[in-house]
Amino acid sequence: MPSSTSADRRVILFDVDGTLVHAAGAGRRALGRVLVSELGQIDHALSGLRLDGMTDRLIVREVLDTLGHPFDDALCDRLLADYVEALRDEIGGPGFEVLRGVEPLLGTLAASGATVGLCTGNVAEGARLKLARGGIDHFFEWGPDAIAGFAHDGEARERIVRAALDRGSARLGSPLHPSDALVVGDTPRDVSAARAHGVPVLAVATGRFSEGELRDAGADGVLPSLEGAAPALLAWLAGGRTPGVPA
């Protein structure tokens, strides 16, 4: 039974792409294959999009809008189901990497008994495939009761954060206060979605955005990477301040 103290109830919610792993374009290639198969020539509808921080459902909507194709949920569901199958092939390609400091950090958090989850724009199986490629999927729980938010929870990233908080509350048996969650991400969209719910954000400059850009976006704390971040995150779990906050 979880302790009722705030510190023991704290939860760290990780983004996936650009935060934990770099998938070397596997997701973009997989979705491109599916869109071509379903819709024919898509020209530059996908290549012209900045996907950082977008949910998979929003990416599909944006591509369909660019092509002048009507959006409907059934089509989106079908495209994303096919995308997962294509991703199984693409994720094994070259260039994939687990970002520096991630595996030892997750190992330290697991050994400490920390509660961690995912807050990602990926569909759940897409996230699992990416983390499994890097051998780090076992650090997270999967299934309907896992503390997580995924693309199936909504197009808007704010809804994904809300879903993760709600599942955290269900798991803990009482409401998870936003200040007792910490989103770790690498894009301004991660920041704005979390802040919309009052959740503090640790941003890491391991994706496309610099430390300055992430700080300007409103991140509570910013680090160059997750390398060496374990002590600061353990301190936050024990009731301390958000890692990466300027002294």
Model-derived features with residue positions:
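Helix-loop "lid/cap" segments that line or gate small-molecule binding pockets
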Residues: 57-71, 164-167
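Acidic, Mg2+-coordinating phosphoryl-transfer loop and its flanking beta/alpha structural elements
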Residues: 183-221
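Membrane-embedded alpha-helical bundles of multi-pass transporters/translocases
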Residues: 35, 83-84
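Short, acidic loop-to-helix structural element flanking the phosphoryl-transfer center
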Residues: 13, 88-118
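Non-catalytic pre-domain segments flanking phosphatase-related domains
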Residues: 1-14, 62, 71, 180, ...
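Active-site neighborhood of HAD-like aspartate-dependent phosphohydrolases
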Residues: 2-48, 52, 58-66
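Substrate-recognition "cap/lid" segment bordering the active-site pocket of phosphatases
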Residues: 123-182, 188-197
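Short acidic-hydrophobic, aromatic-tinged amphipathic segments that line or gate anion-handling sites
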Residues: 149, 221-226
